[in-house]
Amino acid sequence: GTAVSEPVIELSHVSYSYSLSPRERRRWHKRSAVAGKSSKQALWGNDPSSPWALRDVSLTVCRGEFLGLAGHTGSGKSTLVQHLNGLIRPQEGFVRALGLDLSNKKDAAAVKAKVGVVFQYPERQLFAETVTQDVAFGPHNLGLPQDEVDRRVESSLSRVGLDLSTVGDKSPFELSGGQQRRVAFAGVLAMEPEVLVLDEPMAGLDPAARRDFLELIDRLHRDGLTVVMVSHSMDDLANCCDRIVVMNEGAVFAEGTPAQVFAHADELKSIGLGVPAAQRMALALAEAGV
């Protein structure tokens, strides 16, 4: 049978609003209760004017899995990603990561190194004079001894396919866009996280660089990292992920293996998402009775 998977990150009934103050949130609940609905129903009804970016989201990330997050801009994926390592704390519900409660400030700080987040276009956050300094920034901040920092810089550059002796002393801005992104990845890997969270990691790359990056991410996963990847490319998700969670209007719309999720082509189409090319082909053949 399958081994029981160990949860590394758990979200339980998480809701988050960018626009409502705590007082307004209480009023919103009260108003719904007065309207004779349970507050949950009123909150999570498909109200397009809803000020909630996340609505009652429950989700578990298991150790060692490759989890895909899909959904349109505005579906809540990016807000969700920022909850995974305490960058945003939930206003309702709770998040536990690596056994720690992220509503606790001290615990949230401890988790930041262990759950590494690579945001969209991460090369825009490069700032140091040399590649080495940029990658060393995180480990230095952890207060590690210099020889350990050096070891991590070399090993994380090599994990993203860059050679310290070739690029270490260069300015990150002398490198190609794809290489700059690798340097940004290395900076997160140098923290030696247990979970790697990637928000649209292939955004803006040409097809060849995309393929290289997917291979890189796949290799990091095979080497033992738990990976959560946000992507609007259904093909990428179908190729890499063990499990996919589809977000829509701040709530979990569907979840399952790629085959389970993509079997619901019509429902996905209704929220503006396609299915991967291979899946479309299979559907077309099935419809043609082949």
Model regions and ranges:
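Conserved ABC ATPase signature
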Residues: 171-175, 179
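Helix-to-loop junction immediately C-terminal to a conserved catalytic motif
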Residues: 85
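Conserved ABC transporter NBD signature motif
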Residues: 93-103, 111
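Conserved catalytic motifs of ABC-family nucleotide-binding domains
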Residues: 192
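The feature captures the beta-strand-to-loop junction immediately N-terminal to the Walker
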Residues: 70-72
